[in-house]
Amino acid sequence: VVVNILVLHGMNRPGVNESVRENFEQLFNDAQLTYHLAFLEGDTQTLKQVVELLISKGIKHFNIIPILLFPAKHYFEDIPNILKDIKRNYPPMNYIIAEPLGTHQTISNIVKNKIANTLIKNDKVQTVVLLAHGSSTYTEPRQAVQHLAQSCDVFGIPIQTVLLYGAGNYVEHLEKILKQYPQTLIVPLFLRDGYLVQRTKQNIRQQAFAENVTFASAINFVPDLAKVIKDRINELEVLANVCYAS
């Protein structure tokens, strides 16, 4: 038996993880999909707790699906380190980690739909800025966001990228963009319009030249996200059939 574990960032703020859990129940309401949710932050249902509970029930093989758009510290360090620690205490355990969600073509389609829907309502938009979390340590998030921007470059206006952290930081770059393109559409590349997105929007609105900025919504568990996650699970199931055949 191979068990699917969807690993989310989570938060220590009261009620946030419960709200996300409800989002997933709605997302997969009609899908024939068996999975367990685990969180990197929070006191309950942590990745360690979920895996160790399943091991105590006799499960040895796990498909780990990070519900992260782009690869950074959580993907390269936190999730693997937690799993390595568990395996150190329980050597028979095996796991495979899926790719992040942001490289899936459907994510590009979701973002393009958000841009197109805004341009229908506002034909004055001069440029689109994709806003992502980024990383102060890893270059992979910036590369992935730039690749996504290239795939979204179908509207005849410039598609640009800024990050919250690392090279391409929005504090450094956004004012220049807004000065050149006052009518800017900003698309937050986040799974939900949570605390970080709201705080960043507030900071941007206080910047110079930001009076004509338009914000699209974050991905916010649109139905197509279910396809992305199911495809990542299917990819792992193919690998699992090979890896766990013995």
Residues covered by each model-derived region:
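Active-site-proximal alpha-helix that buttresses catalytic centers in soluble enzyme cores
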Residues: V1-S246
